[in-house]
């Protein structure tokens, strides 16, 4: 793990990661994911403002309870992580107001939880996490998760779902239309939206080139 990637909060990172149970072998939600989300969050916070310490803690704890994508508990993952975040920060003697702020940001970051972010830090974290799901990293993560779940790359009989329902549990490429392209239009901050436009273009370019090869 590269603590310099968590600058300027390396000491806090060390304290928080001591409570992180790991990603249970999920390379799409490992410490490199935390590093990328923090890179995104720091870039957005530099333009939009907000409490950087709260944002950092929320970033490191946003996936602290691991739930597989195909689990029936998936929609509860951010709520479970928020509960654990409260316990962790309480053990570190954080003030209640900051604990509440971190917990809300953690709970609201998730696409599947459908919790509306009401604070700037929560909006920044949601944007930062969603940025890691689109663009070329998003492409890599999509196919990585599909491989773990045993999904096919695409439906050879109808790769573009012209005459069938989209099904991203069976076909990896369907996930672009069921989620990833939708993610790119729902950003909370001006800075996040600008970053998302660039990455959405990369997603679309990948889809176009993929379609040309099958």
Q: Where are each of the predicted segments found?
A:
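Hydrophobic, well-structured mid-protein blocks that either form specific transmembrane helices
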Residues: 85-123
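His-Asp-centered metal-binding catalytic motifs of divalent-metal-dependent phosphohydrolases/nucleases
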Residues: 52-71, 77, 81, 101-111
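Short alpha-helical hairpin
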Residues: 2-19
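A short glycine/serine-rich beta->alpha loop
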Residues: 24-26, 70-73
């Amino acid at each position: 793990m590269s603590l310099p990637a968590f600058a300027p909060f390396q000491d806090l990172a060390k304290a928080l990661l001591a409570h992180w149970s790991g990603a249970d072998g999920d390379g799409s939600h490992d410490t490199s994911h935390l590093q990328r989300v923090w890179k995104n969050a720091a870039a957005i916070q530099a333009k939009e403002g907000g409490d950087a310490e709260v944002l950092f803690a929320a970033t490191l704890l946003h996936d602290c309870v691991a739930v597989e994508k195909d689990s029936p508990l998936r929609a509860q993952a951010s709520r479970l992580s928020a509960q654990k975040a409260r316990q962790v920060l309480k053990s570190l003697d954080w003030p209640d107001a900051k604990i509440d702020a971190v917990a809300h940001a953690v709970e609201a970051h998730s696409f599947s939880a459908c919790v509306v972010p009401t604070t700037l830090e929560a909006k920044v974290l949601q944007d930062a996490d969603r940025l890691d799901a689109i663009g070329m990293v998003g492409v890599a993560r999509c196919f990585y998760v599909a491989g773990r779940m045993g999904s096919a790359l695409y439906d050879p009989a109808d790769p573009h779902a012209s005459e069938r329902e989209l099904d991203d549990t069976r076909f990896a490429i369907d996930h672009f239309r069921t989620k990833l392209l939708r993610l790119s239009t729902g950003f909370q901050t001006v800075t996040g939206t600008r970053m998302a436009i660039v990455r959405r273009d990369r997603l679309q370019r990948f889809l176009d080139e993929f379609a040309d090869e099958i």
